[in-house]
């Protein structure tokens, strides 16, 4: 609605449905929402911040507006850690734009005074209330912890956005940006939105890569550009047939892009033109095979016992089985989350505490999974403490079940320290120290 008020008159009967379609048919917006992640919810607060700041220049101190900005900022920080990168970049660019405008209007003194009266107390309250959060963020080496997820810097992440959003989506966003920059009434907002998203992306990609849900820190920019394009395509001064045709073509693209992301068998294509996001809603064909595994767990374990399933490939993981049977929610605690990433998961003591451990023959698999498979599938100081029970053929892979027969001894502990020596050199607190703490606890 704000854009409608700033841009040449448009046909709102077409404009508003198109804007709604841009959001609800956007695969990147739907991916975290369909996976129970709060990232999409955070966009509500980002939108409030952007909207309230769009035409506010700190010429006065309208406290209802300022309180709303403060509340939205506070809530957005709580939503997801990576939204802080967008907050930092947005406010830096916004403040710079406001001060430049104040210099041009010769009101720098009063503008700066009002800005400090609001920003200083707000910063003190937010930092004070969220001190543990900020302390953790400032003292944590995320580049080290998330090193296993890091897929390269800014350039690689730009290419990643090409795959995630698709070429057509990015071209449409670029067209919307050109239109908003062309219109003087929206030029400043377009520059702030573009610079804020660019800054957020540069800051974030120094330590992490933009995954499916982290990419939503760019959503304010993408959506503003697409909304601007919708306003351009539905201008009232355009010929009705041309306006309707343009809106129809955009709507068809949005539907096709969304439909392709559903990954329906035989009805999707892999192309850079469309989003690579997968909203796969098809039913698995291996549920009977998976049921054999979960039935074994339910039959041979009590609810206070656990089973460790050591796999993270071929569409399987421990959590795949844990959540595969809604009729038995106790599986969610009986089947342990698999440890696969060295920098975040560390040594899986679950292989020692669980009644059964299930592994595969993928002994060369990277991270933690492969070495644990090897420890049980070959002769090792660990294998002597397990006995083979049964096996479960799955889709393209076999799961071998072993029962733990004895507590770990010093020889087994030293064996795993040697196996994970490379990881232990970087993260001793979650490898050798964790092993030592466990061994002390069972003595």
Language-model region placement:
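Transmembrane-helix signature of polytopic, membrane-embedded enzymes
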Residues: 1-25, 44, 189
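Transmembrane alpha-helices and membrane-interface helical segments
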Residues: 2, 44-56, 87-99, 172-180, ...
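Membrane-interface transmembrane helices that cradle and orient dolichyl/undecaprenyl
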Residues: 9-11, 47-66, 76, 183-185, ...
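Membrane-interface alpha helices of multi-pass inner-membrane proteins
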Residues: 19-21, 65-81, 91-92, 198-202
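Transmembrane alpha-helical segments
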Residues: 26, 83, 246-288
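Short acidic/glycine- and proline-prone juxtamembrane loop motifs at membrane-interface regions
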Residues: 28-41, 211-212
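Transmembrane-lumen/periplasm boundary regions of multi-pass, lipid-linked membrane glycan transferases
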Residues: 87-97, 102-103, 111-185, 198-208
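C-terminal luminal/periplasmic domains and tails of membrane-associated envelope-modifying transferases
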Residues: 279-309, 314, 323-443
């Amino acid at each position: 609605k704000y854009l409608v008020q700033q841009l040449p008159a448009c046909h709102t009967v077409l404009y508003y449905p198109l804007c709604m379609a841009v959001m609800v048919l956007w695969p990147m917006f739907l991916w975290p929402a369909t996976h129970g992640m709060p990232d999409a919810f955070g966009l509500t607060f980002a939108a409030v911040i952007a909207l309230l700041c769009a035409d506010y220049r700190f010429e006065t101190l309208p406290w209802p507006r300022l309180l709303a900005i403060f509340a939205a900022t506070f809530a957005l920080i709580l939503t997801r850690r990576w939204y802080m990168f967008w907050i930092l970049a947005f406010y830096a660019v916004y403040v710079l734009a406001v001060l430049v405008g104040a210099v041009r209007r010769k009101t720098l003194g009063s503008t700066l005074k009002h800005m400090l009266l609001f920003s200083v107390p707000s910063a003190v309250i937010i930092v004070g209330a969220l001190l543990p959060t900020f302390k953790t963020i400032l003292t944590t080496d995320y580049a080290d912890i998330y090193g296993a997820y890091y897929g390269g810097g800014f350039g690689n992440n730009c290419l990643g956005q090409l795959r995630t959003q698709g070429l057509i989506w990015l071209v449409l966003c670029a067209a919307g940006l050109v239109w908003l920059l062309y219109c003087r009434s929206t030029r400043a907002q377009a520059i702030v939105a573009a610079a804020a998203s660019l800054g957020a992306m540069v800051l974030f990609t120094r330590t992490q890569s933009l995954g499916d849900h982290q990419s939503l820190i760019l959503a304010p920019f993408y959506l503003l550009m697409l909304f601007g394009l919708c306003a351009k395509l539905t201008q009232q001064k355009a010929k009705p047939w041309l306006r309707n045709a343009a809106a129809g073509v955009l709507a068809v693209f949005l539907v096709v892009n969304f439909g392709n992301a559903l990954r329906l068998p035989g009805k999707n294509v892999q192309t850079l033109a469309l989003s690579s996001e997968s909203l796969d809603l098809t039913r698995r064909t291996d549920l009977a095979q998976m049921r054999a595994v979960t039935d074994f767990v339910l039959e041979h374990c009590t609810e206070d016992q656990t089973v460790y399933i050591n796999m993270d490939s071929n569409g399987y993981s421990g959590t795949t089985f844990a959540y595969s049977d809604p009729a038995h929610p106790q599986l969610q605690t009986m089947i342990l989350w698999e440890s696969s990433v060295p920098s975040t998961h560390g040594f899986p003591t679950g292989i020692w505490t669980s009644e059964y451990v299930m592994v595969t023959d993928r002994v060369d698999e990277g991270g933690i999974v492969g070495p644990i498979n090897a420890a049980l599938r070959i002769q090792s100081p660990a294998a002597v403490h397990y006995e083979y029970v049964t096996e479960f053929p799955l889709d393209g892979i076999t799961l071998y079940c072993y029962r733990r027969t004895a507590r770990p001894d010093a020889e087994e502990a030293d064996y795993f320290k040697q196996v994970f020596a490379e990881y232990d050199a970087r993260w001793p607190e979650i490898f050798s120290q964790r092993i030592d703490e466990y061994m002390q606890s069972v003595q």
